[in-house]
Amino acid sequence: MKPTDNNSYRHILKYMGIFGGVQGLNILMSIVRNKVVAVLLGTGGMGLISLFNTTVRLVSDSTNLGLSMSAVRELSAAYEQGDEERLKHRIQIIRMWVALTAIAGMLLCILLSPLLNRFTFSWGNHTLHFIALSPTIAFLALAAGETAILKATRQLRQLALQSVYGVLGALLTSIPLFYVWREAAIVPVIVLAAAIQWVLVIIFSLRRYPLKFSFKQTRLSEGYGMVRLGVAFVASGILASAADFIIRSYLSHAGDIQIVGLYNAGFMVTMTYGGMVFHAMETDFFPRLSGVKNLGGEFNKIVNRQIEASTMVISPLLVAMTVGLPILLPLLFSHAFLPVIDMMRGSILAMYLRAMTLPMEYIALSRGDSRHYLLQEAVAALLLVVAVIAGFHFGGLTATGYALTVASFLEFLFVLVYTYYIYGYRLSRHALLRFVFQFSLGLITLAAVLTLEGWLYWVAGALLLVVSIPHKVSLKFFHFK
C-alpha cells in the first residue's frame, strides 16, 4: 500500500502519534495542575470541581445542538471539493447558529441554577455559583464552533497549538488563584479556563476565515439540515453528561464529597489519560470513514485497521499504567488518593475494550445515521450508570472499577452485533487476535500486581511491558504492515 494512502497503517499511526503526543503534553501540564490542586484543596475540593464541571458539561451538551460534530461534516464536503466561496458561506451560517446556542445555553444555565443546585448538592446553597458559571457555557459553545472550522479545513497544526496553549494558560492562571483563595477560586478558575480556550481558538480561526456576521432568516434556514443531524449528537452528549451527573450525584449522596473526588481521580486517570491515543479518531479517522461512500470490504478494512492500530498503541500504555499506579497516583494527585488504586486497576481493562468499540461506534456517525448512533450511546450510558451504582453498592470503589470493565464488555458485544446487522461490518481475524493477545497480557499484568511484591513486582511488570510493545516478530505474526 502506498505511503500516501490515507487509510494505510502508516497514516493511522502518524496521526495517532501527533495528536496522542499533543494530548500527552497536555496531560503532563494537567498533572502539575492537578497535583497542586489536590494538595491545596484535598479530595473535597477535587470533588467540588468535579461536580461543577459535570454540571457545566451537562448544560453545554444540552444546548449546543451538536454543531461541533455536524459542522465538521458540513464543512468537510465543501473543503474537499475546493469550493472556497461555498466554504466561507457555510462558515458564516455555522457561526450564526453557534452564537445563538451560546446565548441560549448561558441563559438556560441562569434560569435552571436553583434546580441544578438542588439536584447536584445535598448541602449548602450553590445557586449563585451556577449563575456565575453561566458564561462558561457560552465560551464552550463559541470555542467548539471555531474548533469545528479548524478540523474541517485540516488546520492540524493550529489545533495542536491551540490545545497546548489552552492547557498552559489554564495552568498558569489557576495555580495562583487556588493558592490565594483555595475553594473560593473554583468557579472563577472554571470560567477563566473556558475564556482562555475561546480566545485562543478564535485567534487561529479568524486569521484564516475573518468574521462576517449577518443574522438573516434565510441564512439561518440553510443550517436546518445541519442542526437536525446535530440533534443526535446533542442527545448523545446529554446521555453521557447525564450519566456522569447521576453517578456523581449518587456517590455524593451514598458516600460523601471525598468519595466523589476519589472516583473522579480514578476515572480521570484511566478513562481520560488512558484514552489520549483515541484523540486522533475524531480529527482523522471520522473524516476518512465519512469519505467512503459504500459499505463493504474497503469500509470494513478501514475500521479494522483503526482497531488494530488503536490496540497496538494503547496496550503498552495500559500495562505501564497498571504497574506504575503506586508511583503515578501520588505524583498526579497526593497520597490521600491511594485508596482508589484498586478501582483503577480494575477499570484499566475497560480501555482495551474501548479500543475495539470506539471505531465501530463511528460507523453510524459516518453514515449520518443519528438514530442508530443514539441507540448505541443510550445503551452505553445505561450500562455505565448501572455498573457504577451496582459496583459501589456491593463492593465500594474497588468493585466499581471491575464493574466498569464488565459494562465495557457488554457494550462491545452490543455494538459488534448491532453494526453487523445494520451495516454488515465484520471484525477481522487479525484485529481479534491482536485484541485477545493484548487483553490477555492485561489480565496477566493485573494478576501480577495483585499477587507480587518487592522486586518481583517490578521485574514482572517490566517484562510484561516489553512483551506488550509491538516488535518485528509480533507485527509479522499479525500481518501488521
Where is each model-derived feature located?
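Helix-loop junctions and terminal segments of transmembrane helices
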Residues: 65-81, 152, 266, 270-307, ...
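Membrane-water interface segments that mark the loop-to-transmembrane alpha-helix transition
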Residues: 14-26, 52, 61-114, 128, ...
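Alpha-helical transmembrane segments of multi-pass membrane transport and lipid-handling proteins
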Residues: 92-121, 171-172, 179, 277, ...
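Interhelical loop/hinge segments that connect adjacent transmembrane helices in multipass membrane
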Residues: 1-12, 201-244, 284-301, 422-436, ...
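Transmembrane helical elements of multi-pass membrane transporters/channels
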Residues: 14-34, 46, 166, 190-197, ...
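Membrane-proximal transmembrane or re-entrant/amphipathic helices at the cytosolic face
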Residues: 2-6, 446-481
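Membrane-interface junctions at transmembrane-helix termini in multi-pass inner-membrane proteins
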Residues: 138-162, 348-379, 419-422
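Hydrophobic alpha-helical transmembrane segments
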Residues: 127, 131, 160-208, 225-228, ...
